[in-house]
Amino acid sequence: MSQKTVHDQDNALLLETGNTKVAPPPRYQVLLLNDDYTPMDFVIVVLQQFFAMDLKKATQVMLHVHTRGRGVCGFYTREVAESKVAQVNEFSRIHQHPLLCTMKQA
């Protein structure tokens, strides 16, 4: 909601409110990319730890990534998506796996 400052005849401060619509921020897909070296169990751990998936959902997404080459982990604002991508890539690097996480605008 926006406010407009107006002064009346007695120089008193009045505020006028208007209905200004703000567009929602753009959403980004966070994606995992398949590789031939990262164990499936590690991918499931990543999905559970960083994307709050239960075991069943994490297994479904992991199998999708494995069979189709990539899979969507979630939709987020740009800053959150960037943070998740960085966290997953760092976690993979620390554990010496080549798993890659990326993002694209939805």
UniProtKB/Swiss-Prot annotation:
GO biological process: protein catabolic process; proteolysis
Biased composition (Basic and acidic residues): 1-10
Pfam families: ClpS
Region (Disordered): 1-23
InterPro entries: ClpS, ClpS_core, Ribosomal_bL12_C/ClpS-like
Entry's family note: Belongs to the ClpS family.
Quaternary organization: Binds to the N-terminal domain of the chaperone ClpA.
Role played: Involved in the modulation of the specificity of the ClpAP-mediated ATP-dependent protein degradation.
Protein name per the record: ATP-dependent Clp protease adapter protein ClpS
Organism the protein comes from: Xylella fastidiosa (strain Temecula1 / ATCC 700964)
